[in-house]
Structures are given as structure tokens and as C-alpha cells.
């Protein structure tokens, strides 16, 4: 019989920015209690997964029904970064910060549009009127019918969350693992597999970096080996994270709420090269430490040579480094249409058209066979990475996994 459970736990605070977290972590579990469970599988969800929670549940339940595994979905810190049209509790809200208001009124001026007033709290009303104004310009052939005016806005995740990028998300996964093994002690001796696509793929490999003793296999589909700055300090770089076509005539450049900034070096929220370095997967000294902590990690990645985000070369460098350090690392670099099988790999674009479900469906049988008969245990450990004048120590402390963050 299929067992589905949902748990809420305390996880971690933002140690880098010294911010106390106010929300609990939610994670969901599925397994068939009539099967002998042979592995723990964590689907590391990617950006935008929150738009349809039923898809997440379907994928998790599918794997639990079709394989002898317990499957977990973790709704990590700042997981809800896009609007969810049916479930408000998992939906980011569109908002307008001061810079968005400035940008919008500048666009009004560029198009010679005079809003009813200059009240920034009525920006939605102004935009509706502006859209109608642009429709009239198109009707008079003053404006090209396919053209759109560009404005900006920001996604506010629920629960007062914000984009931390990588660290809190990864720690949440490990705390979910530790909590799960307290509830189900029999799971402690199972191999632990992590995997997902895009940001979810990055998270799987990042978890292998900050807690290698908890990763027996990490599966990645098209994750970036380097932090994506658009997601962290995109506002300051004028690089939106997402784009939305709204109504007939507007194009929204979208950012996600964050505490980080790239302009004020004296700010406690300045995103420094040290903060970047810890989130990078390509630091040679860090890779050496990771490999020494767990020489048995299995690392598997799929990546398009033609990925439109230009991340393929970095992934090649990363997997060559893994191999040179003696890790069991396999990169499937998809180079041309002959490698498109239509079952798993459907195109040469970012993420290859391959879902999380397909990624595990493809790799799980061989991994379960490799793990058959081996003994695994849930041990406690720690690892420290030096990044300039900062030291990041990721460690087990009591029943939690946490970050100790200190200046050298």
C-alpha cells in the first residue's frame, strides 16, 4: 500500500546574513509499505516547480510505486518563487519595489502616457490603464501590433522568505533526511540518492559538496556548475530572472526578493566574492576536500552541449575534475540530434526536455543494482571550506545539520 506523509520541521536560519527564519520546512514522503525499501531518493526540485504541486506529488508517487524506494520532496527555503494559480500558500506574489515604480513611470513617460496620479500604491491600476492606452496606439497604427512596453516587478515568496541561493536550500534537504531517519530508523541503512534538473541539479551536486557523507549518488540534469548571478543580484546587474507577457501589450522583467546587493560593499548584505566562492562547484581546493570526505560518491550528469545558458563547458570542467580526484563521475554531454531518443532526451535545449521522473527512471535501475548487498550508515561529520577571509563549516550538531560561519 502506498504511504504518503507530510511533515513540518524546524530547519536552519540564515547564518551568513544573521537572519532568524520564521517559517517551518515542509517535506513530503511516499513509499510502498509492501515493498522492501532499498534506497532513499530525494527529488531536488528546480526553480518554478511550485507552480503545480500536484505534478511534484505525481512524480514522487510514481517512483515509489514503480521502484523499491522511499521518495522525498523538500519544499525548501525560497522554493515558491513563481505564482501558483491554484494554491495560494505555495504561490509567490507579484509586487513592486521602489526601483520597479521608477522604471514603470519612466516607461509611462517614454510612451507619453499620463497616469491618473503618481501614487505608487495604485501601480496596478496605472498598468491596466497603460495597457488600454497602448491598445489604442496600435489601433491607430502608431505602435507596431507585436510590440510590447517593458516594465519590471518582483516576486515575493510566501512566509517572508527570500532568495538565499543554494545554502539554506541544501541544508533544508539534509535536515529533512535527518528528521526522516528519526521517524523511520530502518531508513538509516539505505543508500541516499539526490537528483533533479536545472537548479535542482545544481542542488544535488551542491549537497554532495557540503555534506558528502550523506550522498551516495547525485544525479544532475543541466544544473550550472557556477552560481547564477541573475538569481542572486539580478536587480543590481539589470538581469531579470524571468520574463512574463502580461495582457496584450506589456512585458514584465521579473526579479525575486533577495537581501543580497552588489553595490554597497559596506552593507552586511553585500554579495562578496567569498559568498560566490562557497556556492561554486568549481573550486579545486574544495573539490579535493569533498573527494577525501567520501571517495565512494557516484556523480551522474546530463547536459546539452548547446545549452542556451552557456553552461556546458563549466560542466565538462567539473566532471573532469571529479574524475581526476578518483570519483565515479559520468557526464552525458548531448552533442547532436542523433542522441535524442524521444523517451528521455527530447531536445538539445536546457534540461533536454527530460523531467525529474524521467531522470530517475533512466538511472535508478542500474544504481539500485550497484548498491545491492552494500552496507550504508548514517554517520555524523563536518567539512570546512575556506573562502578568502571567511570559513564555512557544515556540520552535524545534535539532531540538526547546520552552517557555522566565521571570519578568519
Regions found by a protein language model. Give the residues of each.
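Alpha/beta-hydrolase active-site loop
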Residues: 93-184
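Glycine-rich nucleophile elbow surrounding the catalytic serine of serine-hydrolase chemistry
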Residues: 196-206
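Alpha/beta-hydrolase fold nucleophile elbow
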Residues: 186-198
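Short, surface-exposed "cap/lid" segments of acyl-processing enzymes
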Residues: 26-135
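Serine-hydrolase catalytic core
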Residues: 34-35, 244-408
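A short beta-to-alpha transition loop/helix N-cap that caps and shapes the active-site region
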Residues: 80-84, 224-232, 341
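A domain-start/cap signature at the N-terminus of enzymes
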Residues: 1-39, 408
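Hydrolase active-site cap/lid region
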Residues: 209-273
